[in-house]
């Protein structure tokens, strides 16, 4: 588990490698678009023009697109949920944890302390939509196209593929070596 600031700033360098190696973990990222623990500083996912105590004249930076990033890094399971829909969120967490391999669940979660205007429960509740019923979660390019619609975030399973995990690959190397370490 992590937040948008930690996950896509300080800790962002580890995510691509865990995804591409298909490490068997579930990464739940809570995105409130702000560093709530540092008194409302903008995060890598804060919107352009967002005002905070540390950016009183608007945030000039474009936000990253985490779904698109994880899809391009090779994550084998990518989904998005919203804290304002707890039943759907529970279903998505359960699916992510059941997936064998790297699963990433992006959770839109308002910061009720430092964002009383932009990303509130009321605003997000009107913006989010479900992925289209005919969306094919085995099609990475279709998932990327959906991820590009960050002005109307879609909830649901964007992408899923079954492939060997890092643990499987390492087991294969041990088997290939006859269980012997070189040296």
What are these regions (language model features)?
Residues 1-2, 77-82, 104:
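Short catalytic-loop micro-motif centered on adjacent basic/acidic residues
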Residues 1-36:
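Thiamine diphosphate
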Residues 10-14, 20, 37-42, 115-120, ...:
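Short acidic, glycine/serine/threonine-rich loops at helix termini
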Residues 20-26, 30, 74-75, 99-102, ...:
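Short coil/turn connectors at secondary-structure junctions
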Residues 41-50, 86, 93-98, 102, ...:
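Short, surface-exposed, charged loop/turn segments at secondary-structure junctions
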Residues 43-96:
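Conserved thiamine diphosphate
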Residues 83-84, 108-110:
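Histidine- and/or cysteine-centered catalytic micro-motif in compact active-site loops
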Residues 110-183:
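Flexible, low-complexity linker and terminal segments
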